[in-house]
Each structure stands twice: as structure tokens, then as C-alpha cells.
Amino acid sequence: MNRSCWKMLGSAALLAAGCGTETEEIPPAQLGTCMGQTASVIRGAITTDTTFTADKRYILSGRVDVTNKATLTIKPGTILCGDADQLMMNVSYLNIDLDAKLIADGTKDQPIVFTSSRPVGQRRPQDWGGIVLRGHAPINNPPDSGKGPETTCISAEANAGMYGPCGTIRPTDSSGVLRYVRIEFAGREFAPDKELNSLSLYAVGSGTTLDYIQVHRGSDDGIEFFGGTANLSHAVSSACQDDAFDWEFGWVGKGQFWVAMQDLNIGNNGFEADNNRMNAALEPHSNPMISNVTLLGLGQGVVPGGSDKRQGIALRSGVNAKLSNMIVSGFSDVGVFFEEATIAQALAGKVSLTQSLFWQNGKTGESRNISDVTLVGATSFDVRAWVMGQPGNLEADPMLVDPFNPTAPKLTLKPGSPALTGGTPPSDSFFQPVTHIGALGTDDWTAGWTSFPAN
């Protein structure tokens, strides 16, 4: 029996396909508790095709690697728990290697849930590490600038393994499918810039399906792109302790229908957008195309303890981006922030922010929907004048039904909302041709599969 693969639930359980076909008595030490039920403990490496099913519970204990070009398939309705009792440096997380795949294809009625092994009421951010996908798509973070881009192969944060072209550039690389998936109480920070996010996407290619994903109460960023070409639709990042959505290292994917809801006590930016913080000129430039997003901060005037960044959209380190149909509200620092390194990109027409609404950003008694600072780089740049000079941008109440309810938010638009019309869909086949502004119109695509537990 391949003991590095996994141990199944039961006193005489049949091993799943790919881990052998014989039966074996499982000693009690190999069982655990997941959401109050007995579960099989998964540890080490999954090296052959394996399937997890909804009639059982599973505990991820320590780093669980899917490797050797194996595919891990998780059936709709399956619940997996990250072992919260692991020590700091042996944090539990699911790590999908280069050339391996994760097929977690849930449904609206049967989402796949990754959560903490602690009982309901005792769960908290950082209980486990989250999910890491690593692919072969392009990145702009070479270890040696004298080598060609196809040779780039660098180590992911938290020693998760190598990622990048690693000998062959594959823009359409596939790491599998994540659809109708919830990831709760995950993330772990070992040191600054040495972190696990709830969902970390390292050089993930456009052949990967990422649709209907919620990350909730993670200790670091909700979803972060480290280069690559991955596309993401119908995403909710709620109550995460750092940024809701973060990208760097040359991410050039597409996104539509995203929601960010920051926690009322701690939480940073809605978007933290970078090209490369070490060298803003590196190519490929981060240049995503993103439409129909609702970014909700902490509520106007709320300043969380210890948080120094409360910006709706932070455009930094030479990033390019095409952003449209955004709602940005409730960020207690500013709605839109520009770093000086991004000025040249905006002046060259490589950054756009259009058909968007900004409302009640800034501290109580002030309005800072857009940064009022005039930056002086190679050329003076008035952030407010630039943003409000872009087509279709307004400072107006989007009239969301109940946006700042932490446990039962309602993000659809009220009758008469200025966001019901005026949206312009991007000219790209990836995007659904809706004309509302923000992530939701009058239909709530988050209903039925998302959840917002406090603990």
C-alpha cells in the first residue's frame, strides 16, 4: 500500500482509486474530527489519481502535496478540514504541484467546502493554510535577468515549491477546476512576504477554471495572483485580514463579477495591484482586464486597529490594468490610490478605470473617493482629475440593499440605483455582456452557496 498517499475512514475501508485497491484496518490514530464528524486524515503526498467523495469527511494534516502529474478529484458536497492543531512551520494546506491538477467541481446546491478542523464557534483565521496552485504560465520575476523567460523557475512563498515556466512557457496551462468552492479560516503569515493566502495562484494558466469561489476570514490576502494568465469569475473575498484581491509578477488574466467585503475590525485594500515591487519595468507587465466588481471597505470613518492601508483600489509599482464597471465604497483611507511608479503607465494610456461609482470613502466628515494628492513623477499627475476624467465615472450612491451586514450581506441593487444602467461590457469573449455596474445587478448569484460565519 502507498502510505504516502492517504488513509481512509473506517475500520476496514476501501482505498480510493489511485491509492490502491486492497482493504486495510485503519488504527484510531489515523482518524480525526472534521466539523464534528469522524474523518480520515490525509497527509504527505498524493502521487496517483485520487477521488474524495461527499459521503466522507477529510482532514488535511500538514502540507498535502498533489504531485507526480496526479489529479485529485473532489466531488460536489465534500467537506475538507485543515488540521488546526499543527505547529506554525507545519501548517496544513493543499499544494498542487506543477503538472498536477485539482478538480474541485461543486454545484450551487452542493458546494465543496474547505474549512477549519475546529468546532463551529471556535474557528478563526489562520487555523490552516489554504490552497496553493502552481503552474507554467509566464511571470516577470526571474531569478537571473540574464536568462531567457522560459528558464524562469522560482520558489513560491512559504516553501510551497517551484513555479513558472521552468523550461517551457505555457500560457494556457491548466491546474484543474475550482467551481462552487468555499475556503474558510485559512491563510498563514510566517514572516513579511512569507505567507500563505486563502487561495494562492502561482503562474497559473488560462486553461484553469476558476468560477464561483468564496474565500472567507483568511489571515492574509483572500486571493492572490503571482503572475500567470489565469481568469477568475464569480468570486467573493469576505472578511480577510489583508487585501481582498492581490496581484503582482506580471498577471495578465481576466476577471468578472468579483466582490470584496472587508472585516470591520481589520482588513486592508480591496485591490492591491502591482507589477513587480523590486523592478517596476519588468515584463510582461501585470495587465489584467477586470469588470463588474463591488469593493466594500470597513464603512466610512472606521479605522481598524493596526491596519495602515484602507484603499479601495491601490495601483502600485508600474502596474497596467483595464478596470471597468466598479463600485468602490466604505474604504476609510481613500477609494482610489496611485503610487508614483504607475503614473507613466496611466499617462501612456496603459491604465484605465471607467464606468465606475465611488461613494463614502474616507474618514467621517470628509470625502476621499479618489486621492486628492497631485503626484510629481516625470510629469505632474492629479489623481482626482485623471479618475474623474475617465468615461462614465461618478461619485454617487450605488444604492446597495444591505452591503455592510457582516453575516447576511445583500449586495444587489435597489430600484432607482444609478448602477442599474450605464455599464459598458468589455469587448472580449470572456465577459458576459451585462450593462449594470458592480458585481451584482438585481439577481444574486452569491445566494445558495456562500456563507459568512463569524467563527
Where in this protein do the model-derived segments appear?
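Bacterial N-terminal signal peptides that target proteins for export
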Residues: 1-9
